């Protein structure tokens, strides 16, 4: 038997859920296939969303009509603003979630999406389009076949997945779930080069066996925060957590009376005994014994790797994070490990707060297949097979947020492919999502890729606070958000621009009355005429103070005040980055034809020629960012493009 769809999404992790939602919202009849429908968007590792750069991605996903931000807000047990003392470019939200509640809310949300069908099935094979159907054929373990002109693979860690703890190894996509073996074979048969990557997860502890009096409290924010954009103009507010019943009584110091109920996290530190136990057992560590072949993420190393690499460090911080409102299971952030089970028990019990701890689940490593760099284009489509899209860990990334961002863009572009519309490609100056995808299509990924603020050249323009101003107008044009939401965002943009213009034009003079009013509200007096914007540019001055001192200033919403303050305090830096973007866009707008012949370019180095032919950059800007390409190579390509254009004009 067979059934036909417009778009088929294989895998329902964070990438697959966003991909299926976007494709269905854009009018495509969409099928989401997953091994277990009860584990949609399952948090296999850390029960958290956000962090530096990752939080920016989630804000952008929400601004584009995606799901991750709002479901995080509804399932969060704690939310915090990181890097609060630093500038707005690197400030980022991070939330602890109830992992089972998150998965349930995602499933309930997707079940209500028109045009979207959910099916529980193991995908065994994928066959390319043939002349008769012009569709991919996706075959499940029962033999049922599904046909579609566009398929999105979001396979996570399931491609030939292998779990490892000590000397024990077993096939698994994650603990308790079978790997996808045949799918790897099909991808290899289609010509896709596969690489082996590795990730890991820490033990989970029984909260009742932890001495929380020996831990350091990590409370949630006292100030309302959210990943989703909520507009009071539309009657929206930050939603409360959707849990049923009181929190598990094992967690001390719950924050139940603030702006929303929250649970704290708790910090402990490793000990000299902890380090000694690991060193004595390195010969049993799969990471060092040769059992593990895959390359792991450099920026999220296992605890045994930390002890070896940072041998001079006396202790490492570990965070005990509740996995939900009503569960006693506690995640040990910072303790990823694949050491043997007895070693895990011994090392954790060497920490004073964990002397009597019981492990509910042991830590393990997962090895899995990913597709080598250079196989996808900027629309998430594969170079070898048009209509086939990849998103998430199959592209060599790590992290829920990176996966969700790719899934969203793959879903949009798969829908556009089916509908004959042009692809949607975000630039590096438009979004962190654009930086992420550009890196995946222009850089050699030798280890699991993680997003950082340092990867974004224009991070002061790509802040979390302005994600909707940057991206919601596009989402409205695409059909991912409604007109009411877009209108509110546009009104805020206009209010911000008008307020900034007023403040740059409004001058105040150093009279006795003005200075007395400024000082009365905690603002240093002025000695010469200045604009309101110049006063607000002072780091310590807030708009509310200034308006109290100068009552004729306009009343503004909190959202507009935030934009106005950033616009004044960072105006010079913002203007500089905008000039850099303008220069860069000249290169980005210079398209390189897909069939451009690099073999005939005189003067182009052999290394550059090989790189260019492998990655086939779409623009001159992309070409310049490829590893192994220097400015001289770019100049040769530019000269050839101009000559080709001149020849076409002459003809």
UniProtKB/Swiss-Prot annotation:
GO biological process, one term: tRNA wobble uridine modification
Quaternary assembly: Homodimer. Heterotetramer of two MnmE and two MnmG subunits.
Keywords: Cytoplasm, FAD, Flavoprotein, NAD, tRNA processing
InterPro entries: FAD/NAD-bd_sf (IPR036188), GIDA_C_N (IPR049312), MnmG (IPR004416), MnmG-rel (IPR002218), MnmG-rel_CS (IPR020595), MnmG_C (IPR026904), MnmG_C_subdom (IPR047001), MnmG_C_subdom_sf (IPR044920)
Record's GO cellular component terms: cytosol
GO molecular function: flavin adenine dinucleotide binding
Name of the featured protein: tRNA uridine 5-carboxymethylaminomethyl modification enzyme MnmG
Binding locations of FAD: 11-16
Protein family membership: Belongs to the MnmG family.
Source domain of life: Bacteria
Function, as annotated: NAD-binding protein involved in the addition of a carboxymethylaminomethyl (cmnm) group at the wobble position (U34) of certain tRNAs, forming tRNA-cmnm(5)s(2)U34.
Cofactor(s) needed by this chain: FAD
Subcellular location(s) per record: Cytoplasm
Binding positions (NAD(+)): 296-310
């Amino acid at each position: 038997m067979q059934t036909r769809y417009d778009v088929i999404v294989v895998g329902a992790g964070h990438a697959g859920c966003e991909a299926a939602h976007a494709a269905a919202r854009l009018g495509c009849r969409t099928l989401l296939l997953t091994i277990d429908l009860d584990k949609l968007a399952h948090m296999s590792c850390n029960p958290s969303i956000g962090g530096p750069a990752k939080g920016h991605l989630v804000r952008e996903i929400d601004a584009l009509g995606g799901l991750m931000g709002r479901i995080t807000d509804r399932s969060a047990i704690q939310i915090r603003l990181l890097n609060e003392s630093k500038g707005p470019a690197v400030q980022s939200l991070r939330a602890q979630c109830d992992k089972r509640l998150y998965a349930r809310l995602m499933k309930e949300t997707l079940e209500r999406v028109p045009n979207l069908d959910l099916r529980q099935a193991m995908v065994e094979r994928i066959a390319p389009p043939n002349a008769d159907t012009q569709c991919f054929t996706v075959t499940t373990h029962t033999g049922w076949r599904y046909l579609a002109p566009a398929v999105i693979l979001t396979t996570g860690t399931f491609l030939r997945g292998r779990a490892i703890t000590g000397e024990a190894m077993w096939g698994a996509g994650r603990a308790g779930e079978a790997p996808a073996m045949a799918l790897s074979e099909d991808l290899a048969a289609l010509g896709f080069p596969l690489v082996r990557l590795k990730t890991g997860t820490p033990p989970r502890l029984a909260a009742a066996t932890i001495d929380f009096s020996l831990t350091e409290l990590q409370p949630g924010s006292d100030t309302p925060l959210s990943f989703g954009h909520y507009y009071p103009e539309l009657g929206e507010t930050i939603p409360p957590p959707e849990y049923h019943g009181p929190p598990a009584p094992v967690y001390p110091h719950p924050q139940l009376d603030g702006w929303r109920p929250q649970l704290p996290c708790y910090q402990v530190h490793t000990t000299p005994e902890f380090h000694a136990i690991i060193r004595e057992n390195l010969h049993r560590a799969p990471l060092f014994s040769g059992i593990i072949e895959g390359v792991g993420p450099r920026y999220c190393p296992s605890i045994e790797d930390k002890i070896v690499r940072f041998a001079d460090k006396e202790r490492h911080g570990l965070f005990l994070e509740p996995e939900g409102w009503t569960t006693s299971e506690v995640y040990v952030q910072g303790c990823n490990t694949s050491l043997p089970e007895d070693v895990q028990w011994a090392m954790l019990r060497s920490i004073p707060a964990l002397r009597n701890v019981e492990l509910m689940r042991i830590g393990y490593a997962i090895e899995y297949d990913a597709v080598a760099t250079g196989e996808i284009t900027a629309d998430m489509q594969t170079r070898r097979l048009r209509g086939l899209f990849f998103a998430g860990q199959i592209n060599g990334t790590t992290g829920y947020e990176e996966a969700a961002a790719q899934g969203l863009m793959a879903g949009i572009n798969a829908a556009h492919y089916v509908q004959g519309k042009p692809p949607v490609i975000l630039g590096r100056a438009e979004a962190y999502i654009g930086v992420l995808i550009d890196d995946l299509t222009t850089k050699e990924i030798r280890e699991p890729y993680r997003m950082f603020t340092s990867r974004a050249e224009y991070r002061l323009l790509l802040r979390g606070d302005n994600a909707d101003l940057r991206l919601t107008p596009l989402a409205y044009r695409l059909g991912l958000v409604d007109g009411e939401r877009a209108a509110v965002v546009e009104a805020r943009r206009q209010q911000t621009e008008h307020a900034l213009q007023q403040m740059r034009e409004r001058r105040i003079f150093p009279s006795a009355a003005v200075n007395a009013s400024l000082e009365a509200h905690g603002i240093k007096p002025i000695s010469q005429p200045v604009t309101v914007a110049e006063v607000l540019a002072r780091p310590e001055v807030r708009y509310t103070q200034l308006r109290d001192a100068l009552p004729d200033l306009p009343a503004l919403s909190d959202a507009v005040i935030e934009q106005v303050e950033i616009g004044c305090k960072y105006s010079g830096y913002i203007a500089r980055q905008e000039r850099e973007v303008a220069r860069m866009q000249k290169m980005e707008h210079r398209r390189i034809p897909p069939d451009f012949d690099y073999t005939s370019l005189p003067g182009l180095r052999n290394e550059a020629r090989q790189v260019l032919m492998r990655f086939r950059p779409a623009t001159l800007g992309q070409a310049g960012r490829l590893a192994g390409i220097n400015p001289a190579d770019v100049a040769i390509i530019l000269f050839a493009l101009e000559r080709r254009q001149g020849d076409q004009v002459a003809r």
